[in-house]
Amino acid sequence: DYLHKMNPRSRVYGFIGGTSGLFEGSCIEIQEETLKLYRNTGGYDLLGRSADKISEEDYEKVIASCTKYDLDGLVLIGGAYTATDATLLTEFLLNSGIKTRIVVVPCDYSRDLKNNFVETTVGFDTYCRTVSSLIGNICTDSRSAAKYYHFIRLLGRSPSHVVLEAALQSHPNYAIISEEVAAKRMTLLQV
């Protein structure tokens, strides 16, 4: 919306499959009609995503896509690896004389990018809210089956932030922080 307000002739492309689409030059033009269906819902199902790290061999493919679509800017959405890739790719594009500028939108549920410049990342609050809701549902169901124990494991490189946030919202009987257990070398009986 903002881009078209500033310049109605602007075009926005989305690369299908994330960086793999960028490498292959496979994209669609994002138009108002298409975007209406996905507004405020995320959008992974619109374009898909990939977890590819950009290698030096891929740089030339990125240049080909940037040139083919005459891109003034390239927005990468992701976590720490994406930010690192964007930094290296930016240097390469600058040294190659390509006009495309790169912007990174931090999106990472594990808060790996939180620092003095990034207060929070897109995805963390949504992830915590969703996890808390699911844990709350399980807590409600478990009241009717008191003879069973329910264990919920949250995944990630360092899920402690999510565990603590979800525990504050859903009030489970126990919340075990795996980093603390590992640091103290606790056994199952000690936990």
Tell what function each PLM region has.
Residues 1-23:
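N-terminal phosphate-binding or glycine-rich loops at protein starts, especially the Walker A/P-loop
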Residues 12-14, 44-47, 102-104, 151, ...:
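Conserved beta-strand scaffold positions in the cores of enzyme catalytic domains, especially
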Residues 17, 79, 105-107:
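Cofactor-binding loop segments of dinucleotide-utilizing enzymes, especially the Rossmann-like FAD-
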Residues 76-78, 84-88, 92-101, 116, ...:
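Accessory alpha-helical/coil subdomains and C-terminal extensions
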Residues 21-72, 81-82, 109, 120-125, ...:
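Glycine-rich oxoanion-binding loops at beta->alpha junctions
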Residues 10, 72, 173:
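Short acidic/polar active-site loop segments enriched in Thr and Asp
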